[in-house]
């Protein structure tokens, strides 16, 4: 990847030549900086081009600690890439922005930006001013969004089949694609359970918790309406509680410690016995107060200061038939409270019956020799949350399955935000190229030339899809162009059959928001890079 460009300061060179020649002499510098920025950003785009589409390749990423990640998710690849050049870093940020906005299309957005930068290079070499290129690209973008919106067809959230097709298309390019028949319905069900389809305008993905558990295969993934915890039940005798009353405490059930570092000197056995009796009475009192509220399942937040649960407290809780789960992570507390309707308690005096959540069943489930999970189901409170349990034979598979499910959830979220679909398989990009070329003929001068270059750049997506699928990119794109010129708007590359077909009939669809967001963000980034004419290193 190109190194940082250290700007040569022509001003100092000129000033050194004598007082009369204090003019800025290095005229070529802005052009050099611009080309350096473009080539650095293009290098990033070229690095992930091969991972586009269902037949795209995966990348194996090894970090400094030796941890390995296998993925073809554009945002994940770029996030872990060591990028030095500031312009190349802009493309990493671009992919991140697409991930936040749409959740899918993170590879496409970088490839489109790389292709647009390629077009910029050719236009700059022909002597066209960067500002003219930038303004023309903005015009082309506005027209492009119009074209994409015309191509789209509305979708209702009650149309379950369309939602499934969108999720399946997203999963097809992932490692977990062979499990799409399981993961697609799971993703659709998860989103539909946490929103009200009639009024929802977005989906808060924090309401869908993904729990990773090593062991089994991706086939063992499941959707649970309720709460799933990976922590073990501390008192092994109690593994099932019906009509559960669940308390969540943020204080420790162990002997109190002094605030300051004091020392207590015990001089005889009687005093020693008294200390132990006091400790026993103190803990028993805590446990009795918990039992008095009717609590029969107790969750204890993880404590970094000391043991959150002493053996003595566990003994008393066991006798009183209270199921105990300790080491609950702080970041999980909000989700737990929303799911089961409990409230976190920071002091024993506030532990009352109205702070408890309730559920039909709290049960520790054995996973065929690969550990245990605690499931709390039948929650009485209407907090709309669900949990997806992701299983896999090793850490790499589980992490990639989690990313795949996240992308599928994001696709459904896009359809909730903007209820419109367009065809996939490179069809929208070819249609854009064709219609923008027609539009460029209505413009005059340099603008027409720049819009035409923008249109040509759009062909990179179908070309890359064909290349990654082992087809001839030139003949495929040419045939696709002809089919679209004859009015077949939904003709796209069918990667499975290795040819061109009506992509809507093949059920390859994607949300309109993904394409519009990719086009908008890529164009904005390219315009930013184009306007930079100097890189200044500050102290």
UniProtKB/Swiss-Prot annotation:
Residues annotated for ATP binding in this entry: 53, 105-106, 174
Gene that encodes the chain: CCT4
A Pfam family hit: Cpn60_TCP1
Name this polypeptide is given: T-complex protein 1 subunit delta
Residues annotated as binding ADP: 53, 105-108, 172-174, 425, 510
Annotated region described as Disordered, given as residue ranges: 1-29
EC number(s) from the headed UniProt entry: 3.6.1.-
Organism ancestry: Eukaryota, Metazoa, Chordata, Craniata, Vertebrata
Assembly and binders: Component of the chaperonin-containing T-complex (TRiC), a hexadecamer composed of two identical back-to-back stacked rings enclosing a protein folding chamber. Each ring is made up of eight different subunits: TCP1/CCT1, CCT2, CCT3, CCT4, CCT5, CCT6A/CCT6, CCT7, CCT8. Interacts with PACRG. Interacts with DNAAF4. Interacts with DLEC1.
């Amino acid at each position: 990847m190109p190194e940082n460009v250290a700007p040569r300061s022509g001003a100092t060179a000129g000033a050194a030549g004598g007082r009369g020649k204090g003019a800025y002499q290095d005229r070529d510098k802005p052009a050099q900086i611009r080309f350096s920025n473009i080539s650095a950003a293009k290098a990033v785009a070229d690095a992930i081009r091969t991972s586009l589409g269902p037949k795209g390749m995966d990348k194996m990423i090894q970090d400094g600690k030796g941890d390995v990640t296998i993925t073809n998710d554009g945002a994940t690849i770029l996030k872990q890439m060591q990028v030095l050049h500031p312009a190349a870093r802009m493309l990493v940020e671009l992919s991140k922005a697409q991930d936040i906005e749409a959740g899918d299309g993170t590879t496409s957005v970088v490839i489109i930006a790389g292709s647009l930068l390629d077009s910029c290079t050719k236009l700059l070499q022909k002597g066209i001013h960067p500002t003219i290129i930038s303004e023309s690209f903005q015009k082309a973008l506005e027209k492009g969004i119009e074209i994409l919106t015309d191509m789209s067809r509305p979708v209702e959230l009650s149309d379950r089949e369309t939602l499934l097709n969108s999720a399946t298309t997203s999963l097809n390019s992932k490692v977990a694609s062979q499990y799409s028949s399981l993961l697609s319905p799971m993703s659709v069900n998860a989103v539909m359970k946490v929103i009200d389809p009639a009024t929802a305008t977005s989906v808060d993905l924090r309401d869908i918790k993904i729990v990773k558990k090593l062991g089994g295969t991706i086939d063992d993934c499941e959707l649970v309406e309720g709460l799933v915890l990976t922590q073990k039940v501390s008192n092994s005798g109690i593994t099932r509680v019906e009509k559960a009353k669940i308390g969540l405490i943020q204080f420790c059930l162990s002997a109190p410690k002094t605030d300051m570092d004091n020392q207590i000197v015990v001089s005889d056995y009687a005093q020693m016995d008294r200390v132990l009796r006091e400790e026993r009475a103190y803990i028993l009192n805590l446990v009795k107060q918990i039992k008095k509220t009717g609590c029969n399942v107790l969750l204890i937040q993880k404590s970094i200061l000391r043991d959150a649960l002493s053996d003595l407290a566990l003994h008393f809780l066991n006798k009183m038939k209270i199921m105990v789960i300790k080491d609950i992570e702080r970041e999980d507390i909000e989700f737990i409270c929303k799911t089961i309707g409990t409230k976190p308690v920071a002091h024993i005096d506030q532990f009352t019956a109205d702070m408890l959540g309730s559920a039909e069943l709290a049960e520790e489930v054995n996973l065929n020799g690969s550990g245990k999970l605690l499931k709390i189901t039948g929650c009485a409170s209407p907090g709309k949350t669900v949990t997806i349990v992701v299983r896999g034979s090793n850490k790499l598979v589980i992490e990639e399955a989690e990313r795949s499910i996240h992308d599928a959830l994001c696709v459904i979220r896009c359809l909730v935000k903007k209820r419109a679909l367009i065809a996939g398989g490179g069809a929208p990009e070819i249609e854009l190229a064709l219609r923008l070329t027609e539009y460029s003929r209505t413009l005059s001068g340099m603008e027409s030339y720049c819009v035409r270059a923008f249109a040509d750049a759009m062909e990179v997506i179908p070309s890359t899809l064909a290349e990654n699928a082992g087809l001839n990119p030139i003949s495929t794109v040419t045939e696709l162009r002809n089919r679209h010129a004859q009015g077949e708007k939904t003709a796209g590359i069918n990667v499975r059959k290795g040819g061109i077909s009506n992509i809507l009939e093949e059920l390859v669809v994607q949300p309109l928001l993904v394409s519009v967001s990719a086009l908008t963000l890529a164009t904005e980034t390219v315009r930013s890079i184009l306007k930079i004419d100097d890189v200044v290193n500050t102290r």
